[in-house]
Amino acid sequence: MMGQNQTSISDFLLLGLPIQPEQQNLCYALFLAMYLTTLLGNLLIIVLIRLDSHLHTPMYLFLSNLSFSDLCFSSVTIPKLLQNMQNQDPSIPYADCLTQMYFFLLFGDLESFLLVAMAYDRYVAICFALHYTAIMSPMLCLSLVALSWVLTTFHAMLHTLLMARLCFCADNVIPHFFCDMSALLKLACSDTRVNEWVIFIMGGLIVVIPFLLILGSYARIVSSILKVPSSKGICKAFSTCGSHLSVVSLFYGTVIGLYLCPSANSSTLKETVMAMMYTVVTPMLNPFIYSLRNGDMKGALSRVIHQKKTFFSL
């Protein structure tokens, strides 16, 4: 496993989470429950939007893609974490490590772009309500989703190819629970300046600019709803925006703090906790915040259940 270049390294070792042995089973059960909640919650959203014609709108098109992204985002890291906790085998093959990094970047970036699309959809719905249908046409919505997939695929592939050209020498221990890009760069024994510059530049395009666009959209929304005379309408709009912004702040806050503004004395434990927030907690909370508390989603669930009961009663 030791060697002078990347071809001699057959695998990496994931240190995982700093958990005491006596807490291992409890943490395993907790993460398994959180992962299953994420899967079931996001799958429920996707199925309901697919089955109920009332939800075939731009907002729920973006939401179904966001749920798919959350589902895949968690599936990139959590199953491997659970496997390592159960088998006590921290190794991950070199190719699998780069593959995990690729899909981690892909679905993480995809969520960033979809959050922008959702913010824009709500901006148009509130600020240009009379022209909403004309502006948010099916072609525009599909184009926004397709563009999100294309850009994130390119970005993830770029970082993966740049990582694959690096040399890894003696140290193959990753102090994380997944193949984190910044952790891999610290293990490289070749020049990583190109990688670091690409992370800084592309990070601004992929993370910071979408975050600013979301803030700009909601600033316009707040400005618009303050002019609405109905206090009920204002409360409803603020409630919707508040839920969305809470998840946006959680996701972008940890990502920006971890990758774009790292502190010189940041500990591995702190980085791991921050990573757990946006890889495990946020995808689990999204179904509850975005949909399961939504009246349209509850109505769709009721209609689907009623249709099933009617079908089986025939």
Swiss-Prot record:
It is a multi-pass membrane protein. One of its GO terms (molecular function) is olfactory receptor activity. Disulfide bonds join 97-189. Pfam families: 7tm_4. Residues 50-57, 121-139, 220-236, 293-314 are cytoplasmic. Glycans are attached at residue 5. InterPro entries: GPCR_Rhodpsn, GPCR_Rhodpsn_7TM, Olfact_rcpt. PANTHER family: OLFACTORY RECEPTOR. This is Olfactory receptor 1E1.
